[in-house]
Design a protein with these regions (language model features):
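Short helix-start
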Residues: 2, 6-10, 14, 29-36, ...
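Extracellular/periplasmic helix-exit of transmembrane alpha-helices
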Residues: 135-149, 289-297, 325-355
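Loop-to-transmembrane helix boundary motifs in multi-pass membrane proteins
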Residues: 164-167, 202-206, 322, 367, ...
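Hydrophobic alpha-helical segments and their helix-loop junctions in multi-pass secondary transporters
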Residues: 233-260, 277-291, 457-466, 491-503
Length: 504
């Protein structure tokens, strides 16, 4: 915080404390004109009029003067100080749902996809890391904006706006796809530990699953969110690995800046898979719900939220841009590593992230392989609870259950049951010999179909003034959002056609 900002914060906080102290005295009148508020507390009439117009301060017109009640002024002073605390927090402290959402996008299954396209096509698809960034950001900013403004989760808003009959099949598809992804990620985490330590697969898998379930179920939200933020640091392993393998940086820059497209089934399918891995439904529900969790944790939920919303939207945008930027930098780093090491040595078949880590060892050395492996496990610890949580939030809102990681298990039994069952089924997929990696193909199809439908609803709601009021999304966000929706819809159609024609 700068010196000027610190002084501003100190003065405003002192004013709010004085308002609360004065208004707490019983001898004070119940109502004040704006002129009286200005004289007593130094708030300009123009500022008071703005607060009243935006709904941050409740005021009424009486006898030609604007009047504010003692209760309304007290509520504003209390709310305002909490908003000030958010506004003047350091940038790193304001990072939360957006950062965690972006980091969880690079889950072990996603790492497997990015490694596969890097090994098979080299740097030919590296440009997607740059060109998908504004579209991905537009989607995530809009879902977060909807939750901050409406104070409700995405599933709840879509259900009330378009009907639960429309929403329910989408949520069921989300649950199925998330559970398969959880199974694949748990398996990849256990396999990655086997590359580092002399451990057995099954006991390691069970231990990891139980550990995640206990953390997500019993650790208070504010502590758990802090753990997830630190786990995001595991993504640095991929950036370091990309530097260690010494790629041709001129070729990298050229591939990122200039799009390359091949009109054959395999290349188009790889583009579709990359888009589906990068812009995926569980991220929508997770960030939407975690924005609410953050506001509850900071106590900035309430009826007169216009002043808080303006600040929270600014903080959310910085958080979301940081998270999505990190996600796509890591996507690019993984493609660079796979293209430079695996593809360059003729290794084009990569079935999972753990097999990629094993293949790196003889080609790039122990250090690069160990970094890649640590990244798989660390990001898995972040992504698996995010997927399970996204399923729980979506289903709880459909059925009207109590929800939230800020609640205890006894307060939201249905919500936590979905988390535990999702993890248990993911565990069972591995223990029963069902290959979750193969099942990921069908999960990708589900996600590819569900995503554009959800995005259509998201951007319709995000631009609806009846729902969003003065806080509809900026025009640039709407443009990139609709471009993403059209591209994802077209990708889903291409995927269906490729399947129907039996294309590889």
């Amino acid at each position: 915080m700068s010196k000027a900002a610190a002084l501003s914060f100190s003065a405003l906080a002192k004013r709010n404390r004085r308002i609360r102290a004065v208004l707490s005295e019983q001898r004070e009148p119940d109502r004040f004109t704006f002129e009286e508020v200005r004289e007593r507390f130094g708030i300009p009439v123009r500022k008071l009029a703005y607060l009243a117009r935006t709904g941050a301060l409740e005021a009424t017109a009486e006898g030609g003067s604007l009047v504010v009640s003692r209760e309304a002024l007290l509520a504003y002073a209390s709310q305002s100080e909490r908003v000030l605390q958010v506004r003047h927090s350091s940038f790193l402290k304001t990072l939360g749902p957006g950062l965690i959402t972006g980091a969880s996008d690079d889950d072990p299954s996603g790492i497997g996809t990015y490694t596969s396209i890097g090994a098979l096509y080299g740097l030919a698809l590296a440009w997607l890391a740059l060109y998908l960034l504004p579209m991905m950001t537009a989607v995530q900013e809009t879902v977060a904006r909807i939750s901050i403004v409406t104070q409700r989760g995405l599933s709840s808003v879509i259900g009330d706006t378009y009907g639960k009959k429309v929403l329910f099949p989408l949520v069921v598809a989300l649950l199925v796809a998330n559970t398969v992804n959880i199974g694949a990620d748990l398996g990849a985490m256990a396999a990655s530990l086997q590359l580092l330590l002399p451990v057995e697969f099954a006991p390691t898998l069970v231990t990891v699953t139980v550990g995640i379930a206990l953390l997500e179920t019993f650790v208070p939200y504010h502590r758990y969110a802090r753990i997830l933020k630190w786990l995001a640091a595991a993504l640095l392993a991929y950036v370091v690995t990309a530097v260690v393998v010494k790629p041709d940086w001129f070729s990298v820059l050229r591939s990122v800046a200039v799009p390359h497209v091949e009109f054959n089934a395999g290349f188009v399918a790889a583009m579709v898979a990359t888009m589906g891995t990068t812009i995926t439904p569980y991220l929508f529900f997770w960030q939407s719900s975690e924005e609410l969790e953050e506001k509850k944790d900071r106590h900035t939920m309430g009826e007169r939220r216009a002043a808080a919303v303006a600040v929270e939207l600014r903080e959310m945008r910085k958080d979301t841009y940081a998270g999505m930027g990190i996600a796509n930098i890591v996507f690019l780093a993984i493609v660079i590593t796979a293209a430079t090491v695996l593809g360059a040595h003729g290794i084009t078949e990569v079935s999972s992230a753990s097999t990629a880590a094993a293949a790196l060892k003889p080609l790039a050395g122990d250090f690069a392989s160990a970094l890649f492996t640590i990244g798989i496990f660390g990001v898995g610890l972040l992504a698996v609870p995010v997927m399970a949580g996204a399923s729980a939030y979506a289903l709880a809102e459909v059925f009207g259950w109590k929800e939230g990681l800020g609640r205890k298990v006894r307060q939201a039994p249905g919500f936590y049951a979905v988390i535990v069952v999702s993890l248990a089924v993911g565990l069972a997929l591995n223990l029963l010999g069902i290959d979750p990696i193969k099942a990921l193909y069908y999960a990708a199809i589900l996600n590819g179909i569900v995503a554009p439908i959800l995005m259509f609803f998201i951007f319709r709601i995000g631009s609806n003034k009846k729902i969003m009021g003065q806080f509809t999304g900026p025009w640039a966000i709407r443009v990139f959002g609709w471009i993403a929706t059209v591209l994802m819809g077209a990708s889903a159609l291409v995927l269906v056609v490729l399947m129907a024609t039996g294309a590889p």
